[in-house]
């Protein structure tokens, strides 16, 4: 059965045309779906006959909130959602000066295997549909009562490993009859899937691309990120340069500051050399503590020194604010804990 949450306006128009309905009905239904309704009966300007016909061939499938963690030190809220098939994902709602930002997941789990990331810990289940990505934004907006104006695809999963569904989601969430979130207010974070970066450069979608770099050296990056064994740093930087030239958009390079691993002055100088002359920005991220990987965040002194070296070499650099640190707001850990506890319960029953 078709989930209407996954459909673009054009797809709805085609579907309604095949049902013998006028084109304007599709826009009415699209608006209802994107307003957050949970039942066909909520479509008050649609005839009962059409609602009944729709209910026979389609559904409106919504997420279920399993858990909600509210930070005591800021307004950050972490959500644990259950999908229709029982899979679990995470999202985070964050408040900034410019308003509210939704950090959403693109997959149930991740197959990239980055050593410092909790998303990989519980394994990969499947890609999320466009509707499941959209619903994370809608449900957090409904639950909080706050308008979400920015989205970051930095939750569980590698967005470019779910390319077609992510592109479709972006078009739905940006639509003027939908949530109407501007493309320039959307960021997509990738571990560096080079062919997809090159494909994204041709899409004419002016989002912000963030690339998880974390080292300027192949040996160090490969040890932390298996994807580097397939797409080495030279290939990645080459693709990023093509992206900036094609889109005229600045790339953000994310750099997790890990004590004793990649936070030395030499690491900073190597990074500055790698990025010299690029249209880019570096975001230094104090690494989150993830059970089992042994990584610890760099000291503030190390981070500030690293930042100063980059800036002295002409690289624009910021340090990410640690929102929701008391609830471990980085995505993946809560899902892993939930899956582990369920597994233990089944094993001991």
Swiss-Prot record:
Gene3D superfamilies: 1.10.150.530, Aldolase class I (3.20.20.70). It holds the Pfam family RlmN_N. Its cofactor is [4Fe-4S] cluster. Keywords: 4Fe-4S, Cytoplasm, Disulfide bond, Iron, Iron-sulfur, Metal-binding, Methyltransferase, rRNA processing, S-adenosyl-L-methionine, Transferase, tRNA processing. InterPro entries: Aldolase_TIM, Methyltransferase_A, RlmN_N, RNA_MTrfase_RlmN, rRNA_lsu_MTrfase_RlmN/Cfr, rSAM. GO terms for cellular component: cytoplasm. Belongs to the radical SAM superfamily. RlmN family. This is Probable dual-specificity RNA methyltransferase RlmN.
């Amino acid at each position: 059965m078709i989930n209407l949450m996954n459909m673009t306006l054009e797809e709805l128009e085609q579907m309604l045309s095949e049902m013998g309905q006028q084109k304007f009905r599709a826009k009415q239904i699209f608006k209802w779906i994107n307003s957050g309704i949970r039942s066909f009966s909520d479509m008050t300007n649609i005839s009962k006959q059409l609602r009944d016909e729709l209910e026979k061939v389609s559904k409106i499938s919504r997420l279920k909130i399993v858990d909600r963690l509210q930070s005591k030190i800021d307004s950050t809220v972490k959500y644990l959602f259950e999908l229709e098939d029982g899979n679990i994902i995470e999202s985070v709602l964050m408040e900034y000066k410019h308003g509210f930002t939704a950090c959403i997941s693109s997959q149930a789990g991740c197959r990239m295997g980055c050593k410092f990331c909790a998303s990989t810990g519980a394994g990969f289940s499947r890609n999320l549909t466009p509707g499941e990505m959209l619903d994370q934004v809608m449900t957090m907006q409904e639950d909080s009562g706050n308008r979400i104006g920015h989205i970051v695809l930095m939750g569980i999963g590698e967005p470019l490993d779910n390319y077609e569904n992510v592109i479709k989601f972006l078009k739905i969430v940006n639509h003027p009859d939908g949530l109407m979130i501007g493309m320039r207010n959307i960021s997509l974070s990738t571990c560096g899937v080079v062919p997809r970066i090159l494909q994204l450069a041709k899409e004419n979608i002016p989002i912000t691309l963030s690339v998880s770099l974390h080292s300027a050296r192949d040996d160090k990056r490969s040890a932390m990120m298996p994807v580097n064994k397939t797409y080495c740093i030279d290939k990645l930087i080459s693709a990023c340069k093509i992206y900036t030239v094609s889109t005229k958009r600045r790339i953000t390079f994310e750099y997790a500051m890990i004590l004793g691993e990649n936070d030395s002055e030499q690491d900073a100088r190597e990074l500055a050399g790698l990025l010299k002359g690029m249209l880019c920005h570096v975001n230094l991220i104090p690494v989150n503590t993830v059970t089992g990987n042994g990584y610890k965040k760099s000291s503030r002194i190390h981070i500030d020194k690293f930042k100063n070296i980059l800036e002295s070499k002409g690289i624009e650099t910021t340090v990410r604010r640690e929102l929701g640190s008391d609830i471990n707001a980085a995505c993946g850990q809560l899902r892993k804990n939930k899956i582990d506890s369920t597994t233990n319960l089944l094993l001991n029953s």
